[in-house]
Amino acid sequence: LYEMLNRFRGKLKMAIATGSPNKFLRIVLDKLKIEEYFDVLQSSDEIGEGKPSPEIYLKAAQKLKVLPSECVVLEDSCNGALSGKRAGCYTIAVPSEYTYKQDFSFVRYIARDLYDAAGHIESLMSLQREHNTIL
């Protein structure tokens, strides 16, 4: 996790968009010491609907001041991935040991792990630079 965060620090705006309440998000951020990496923290407290509603990703994109189509979403659950897709984000599934049997066929990319996801994001960034466009 830390390697991936450091890899993109200063290169991409980063946000957390979690279906958990802010108090739980704060516990995790404090334990892992990762809050400094993120430009936006979006918890379910400000959102009327849970995932798979796109609302949480739309709100995070708005706070980042970017279009949803300019966002890459990493998700480990089918409902979360569907939320990202419905928001119009480029969605990457990173299934966990608990969700790997779920059907992620609707996402743009299924990563084996965070390293694979990071490599894919870097290839998207490279394509964007070459063609001066957002995928």
Predicted regions and their residues:
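Hydrophobic beta-strand core positions in alpha/beta domains
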Residues: 15-16, 93
